[in-house]
């Protein structure tokens, strides 16, 4: 639990390690991504992919999904106990795209899960390397965050679609461990808890018996994770109430929705990590780079540097704009779906536009799409500057509330104001301050009312030149204060459906 003074850095969570010093952390994260790279190279050999085909992001995603599926114990067990027609529980596969006579062809491949597990372990010194698997899950989650909107999921749990900036990591599988929990947004945790409470309301036996005891432990653990994301005493006290409730019901759902809304201004701490597609690590390993020896960090210059030197391709549909496809993948690589566009644009060095203006659909290609008209192009994933990823949420001076635009969860530790429409947010807080959490609610509302949109977050923090790897000369950008930048305004993205 974060509040117990046992904060581990994300890299420690990511690599499952106990407390380590910076060098050890860099080495173990390096070992993790190096293992991913070695696995990818081996898979390309197995599949006889050309260099170009191996750099295709769609092929990378298929290979990543195969290894995640091969290690999904729970689902594998379920598939074996509930055999469904046409699904071999022991096999996994997906589309692989090959270049034939100037055209792209789709080939569906199937592999034994056991074989995939063997190749993965071999690439990871014989270990299961759960950290590497989680890393791939977070990359897929970041890609989903940048690609899809979760309006429907929000509405289903009684939340407001404008709270989309709280939904980081909403598509992460349950099994993503501590590293996964660290990158989940406040809204994601609230949604998981509400779903659980609703099941308890509809199913009398949900909290009962031996199973119910396990359910209860999971419920309290999720409450503690969410509590650890809040930075004000009143929000945390409300989480204690929700956690200790004998029989969670509608009152708890109300409290959770209230807390989620409050997080639009009193932002939670949510970790951000640059998780790259497996093919990027593969390219680096193939060129002789030794990640473990050199060390690697997910939150510093390393991912930027890796992307400066990697050429990755993507399939492009006939009506898509390659520059927009590049923006989508760039945002996913840096976990920047919920970042202020002013900040992202400055770092990237080219204008980053809101999703409603993108002429591109998702990266993955459905099995019924026509390959005849598919083209491919280079993804432009380079940046002008680099900046340190944050896990703080950007609230100004410690406990005081800071302004939060209705759609930002900062990714980069870079000075800016967080403009917001206080009226829009506060409108959601009329009325209900009675009940057992009334004093906490009143206190939270007071803090929110005192928040000023002109307050500066991340005071004095700047971006760095790519030659400045020790982060010695911060360049503090000046932004047009009035011009807020949410990626989700005027949104028309498709919904995420499993």
Swiss-Prot record:
InterPro entries, per the entry: Flu_NP
GO CC, alphabetical: helical viral capsid; host cell; host cell nucleus; ribonucleoprotein complex; viral nucleocapsid
Alphabetical keyword list: Capsid protein, Helical capsid protein, Host nucleus, Host-virus interaction, Ribonucleoprotein, RNA-binding, Viral nucleoprotein, Viral penetration into host nucleus, Virion, Virus entry into host cell
Compartments it resides in: Virion; Host nucleus
Changes after translation: Late in virus-infected cells, may be cleaved from a 56-kDa protein to a 53-kDa protein by a cellular caspase. This cleavage might be a marker for the onset of apoptosis in infected cells or have a specific function in virus host interaction.
Quaternary context: Homomultimerizes to form the nucleocapsid. May bind host exportin-1/XPO1. Binds to viral genomic RNA. Protein-RNA contacts are mediated by a combination of electrostatic interactions between positively charged residues and the phosphate backbone and planar interactions between aromatic side chains and bases.
Name this polypeptide is given: Nucleoprotein
